Amino acid sequence: MLMNSIYSFTLQELKKELTKNNIKAFVAEQIFDWIYSKHVDSFDEMKNISKENIEKLKQLFSFENMVVDKLQVDKHDGTVKFLLKLEDGNFIETVIMKFNYGYSVCVTSQIGCNMACKFCASGLIRKKRNITVGEFIKQFIIAKEYVEKNFNDKLTHMVVMGIGEPFDNFENLIQFFEVIKQQKGLCISPRKITVSTCGLVEKIKEFADLKNQVNLAILLHAPNNEIRNKIMPINKVYSLDKVIEAMDYYIKVTKRRVTIEYILIKDVNDSDENAVELAKLLKGKLCYVNLIPYNKVVENNYFRSVRGKQFFDVLKKNNIQATIRLERGSSIDAACGQLRIKKILELRNAKV
């Protein structure tokens, strides 16, 4: 029998599940305390739960078997990148970053990615499967424990911008948000969470209707369809005008500002004309642009732009709010998915 992960339930859902199996509802609060405050990953360690109930719990629920295969720490800014091995032998990446407001974690939503953005390492290997709710939560717990142990601090923020397209794993993603905000659990405010999408229009609208206060970032990366078609194949399904229309719907429904992510790629999308066109596209909208320095991926022929400041100045001149993202993880495999690809190639070569 395939058991449900203990990490996949909200407190109320777990209470109902326990009651259904003749275990008192209050045991759910004890379990939450053990797994989210004391960080145990075995029912046998839960000393205030009866042996009879522990045996029942072992038959009903599983713990995520996720281990750190490799750890990289940037020598300049302290960014931490984990390569995590999952129970089925797959690998994912999770990253801890330090900001002036505290520590944030970037989690992975899929094993591989089908969006196939031409500049991205994540899409070099196609999607194998979605990350489960339990695997989402376990990534956060591993990062949380690391921050508490090594930095004597708290992990307070999260972005779902790792490997994969989060909105292509919509059901698990939304349940993850419900679980992580539980007050007697990890208690992460939705306002401290940001999720990104490359532009799955129907899901942007569905996400808007939830009004769950999680922040939205749209990976635009181009000011027109011609450029976006070349670097983001998804644009041939969801064209730029449809993505902007979905963003407008999100803003209207939620009254929340959207982040526009824009990776600057040399001689592709970084000219003054591109900046002017982007400014016209976003004029009057409740959004701001996050300009991102490109991390080179050896498997493709794209390069980092040196025109970040000029591009920023053009946006500013045209009354578009923008920032240039501070580069992090420069001394490690910074590009999303790079560490995973290295591991996969290493394993393939070992078999030859």
Curated annotation (Swiss-Prot):
<dbReference type="InterPro" id="IPR040072">
    <property type="entry name" value="Methyltransferase_A"/>
</dbReference>
<keyword id="KW-0698">rRNA processing</keyword>
<keyword id="KW-0808">Transferase</keyword>
<dbReference type="GO" id="GO:0051539">
    <property type="term" value="F:4 iron, 4 sulfur cluster binding"/>
</dbReference>
<dbReference type="InterPro" id="IPR027492">
    <property type="entry name" value="RNA_MTrfase_RlmN"/>
</dbReference>
<keyword id="KW-0479">Metal-binding</keyword>
<dbReference type="InterPro" id="IPR048641">
    <property type="entry name" value="RlmN_N"/>
</dbReference>
<dbReference type="InterPro" id="IPR004383">
    <property type="entry name" value="rRNA_lsu_MTrfase_RlmN/Cfr"/>
</dbReference>
<dbReference type="InterPro" id="IPR007197">
    <property type="entry name" value="rSAM"/>
</dbReference>
<keyword id="KW-0004">4Fe-4S</keyword>
<comment type="similarity">
    <text>Belongs to the radical SAM superfamily. RlmN family.</text>
</comment>
<dbReference type="GO" id="GO:0002935">
    <property type="term" value="F:tRNA (adenine(37)-C2)-methyltransferase activity"/>
</dbReference>
<dbReference type="Pfam" id="PF21016">
    <property type="entry name" value="RlmN_N"/>
</dbReference>
<keyword id="KW-0489">Methyltransferase</keyword>
<feature type="domain" description="Radical SAM core">
    <location>
        <begin position="99"/>
        <end position="333"/>
    </location>
</feature>
<feature type="disulfide bond" description="(transient)">
    <location>
        <begin position="106"/>
        <end position="336"/>
    </location>
</feature>
<dbReference type="Pfam" id="PF04055">
    <property type="entry name" value="Radical_SAM"/>
</dbReference>
<keyword id="KW-0963">Cytoplasm</keyword>
<dbReference type="InterPro" id="IPR013785">
    <property type="entry name" value="Aldolase_TIM"/>
</dbReference>
<keyword id="KW-0949">S-adenosyl-L-methionine</keyword>
<keyword id="KW-0819">tRNA processing</keyword>
<keyword id="KW-0411">Iron-sulfur</keyword>
<feature type="binding site">
    <location>
        <position position="196"/>
    </location>
    <ligand>
        <name>S-adenosyl-L-methionine</name>
    </ligand>
</feature>
<feature type="binding site">
    <location>
        <position position="120"/>
    </location>
    <ligand>
        <name>[4Fe-4S] cluster</name>
    </ligand>
</feature>
<feature type="binding site">
    <location>
        <position position="113"/>
    </location>
    <ligand>
        <name>[4Fe-4S] cluster</name>
    </ligand>
</feature>
<keyword id="KW-0408">Iron</keyword>
<feature type="binding site">
    <location>
        <begin position="164"/>
        <end position="165"/>
    </location>
    <ligand>
        <name>S-adenosyl-L-methionine</name>
    </ligand>
</feature>
<feature type="active site" description="Proton acceptor">
    <location>
        <position position="93"/>
    </location>
</feature>
<dbReference type="GO" id="GO:0070040">
    <property type="term" value="F:rRNA (adenine(2503)-C2-)-methyltransferase activity"/>
</dbReference>
<dbReference type="GO" id="GO:0070475">
    <property type="term" value="P:rRNA base methylation"/>
</dbReference>
<dbReference type="GO" id="GO:0000049">
    <property type="term" value="F:tRNA binding"/>
</dbReference>
<feature type="active site" description="S-methylcysteine intermediate">
    <location>
        <position position="336"/>
    </location>
</feature>
<dbReference type="GO" id="GO:0005737">
    <property type="term" value="C:cytoplasm"/>
</dbReference>
<feature type="binding site">
    <location>
        <position position="117"/>
    </location>
    <ligand>
        <name>[4Fe-4S] cluster</name>
    </ligand>
</feature>
<feature type="binding site">
    <location>
        <position position="295"/>
    </location>
    <ligand>
        <name>S-adenosyl-L-methionine</name>
    </ligand>
</feature>
<dbReference type="GO" id="GO:0019843">
    <property type="term" value="F:rRNA binding"/>
</dbReference>
<dbReference type="GO" id="GO:0030488">
    <property type="term" value="P:tRNA methylation"/>
</dbReference>
<keyword id="KW-1015">Disulfide bond</keyword>
<comment type="function">
    <text>Specifically methylates position 2 of adenine 2503 in 23S rRNA and position 2 of adenine 37 in tRNAs.</text>
</comment>
<protein>
    <recommendedName>
        <fullName>Probable dual-specificity RNA methyltransferase RlmN</fullName>
        <ecNumber>2.1.1.192</ecNumber>
    </recommendedName>
</protein>
<dbReference type="GO" id="GO:0046872">
    <property type="term" value="F:metal ion binding"/>
</dbReference>
